[in-house]
Amino acid sequence: MATEAASINFRGINGRGMGAPILLIMMLAMIVIPMPPIALDMLFSFNIALSLVVLMVTVYALRPLDFGIFPTVLLITTLLRLALNVASTRVVLLNGHTGTGAAGKVIESFGEFVVGGNYAVGLVVFAILVIINFVVVTKGAGRVSEVSARFTLDAMPGKQMAIDADLNAGLITQDEARKRREEVGQEADFYGAMDGASKFVRGDAIAGIVITLVNIVGGFLTGAALKGWTLTESLSVFTRLTIGDGLVSQVPSFIIAIAAGLIVARAG
């Protein structure tokens, strides 16, 4: 009996989509296993493209429930960015002494082209982007999610009573009443999930600041203490790589935060 039950459960699991479990395993692998620069380039490019796709879907969604899986997408993209941060930090600290191309072309491009190769300008741009993301977009989206969840839950009994009244009056059929009840429940579940998922966006913004500071200090110690570099050399190389790493992570984070703000602020 136990063998038969295990076989049934395995067949049920095998029949479902395995995309999310595989993605989570890949994230764990990125945290534990050192990754080559070309793999980081592909993953960073995928992360930016994914954030743009999420933003486009959010913009064209007529109602929040049209993109009902957004809280799950928000969590997965946040975990992906954090895993990429850990993987890129390892590469920067281990191979940063070989030059600005040690962590891949994407990080090098953000460090060289976007900020003109000047790490002082890069620090200012990164700080401004983090402040806008953390103080304005993320905080506002989190507050809207919290208020929307509260009012949606408070309005549930009234909506259910209105549906029952329409059904008793013969204005709607049983199927229409069932559909409306499902929509009311889905709306409450969505805003409740967004209220919790918005905390991940806020935590991701804080983690981006901390990781950048740790990278700068770790890069300085690696260059000065282990490689015998001067302060200027260590700051020039590792800070440039760190700023490139920070920007390539904060840009998709900023885009996802905008998408979260758009979908929770949309009425209806």
Regions inferred by a protein language model and the residue ranges of each:
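Alpha-helical transmembrane segments of integral membrane proteins, especially early/N-terminal helices
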Residues: 9-12, 85, 89, 206-218
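Canonical hydrophobic alpha-helical transmembrane segment
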Residues: 53-55, 250
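Juxtamembrane helix-loop transition segments at the membrane interface in multi-pass membrane proteins
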Residues: 2-10, 40, 47, 55-76, ...
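N-terminal accessory targeting/assembly segments
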Residues: 2-5, 20-25, 31-32, 52
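Hydrophobic alpha-helical transmembrane segments
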Residues: 20-24, 30-48, 59, 68-78, 113-139, 199-200, ...
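N-terminal membrane topogenic signal
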Residues: 8-21
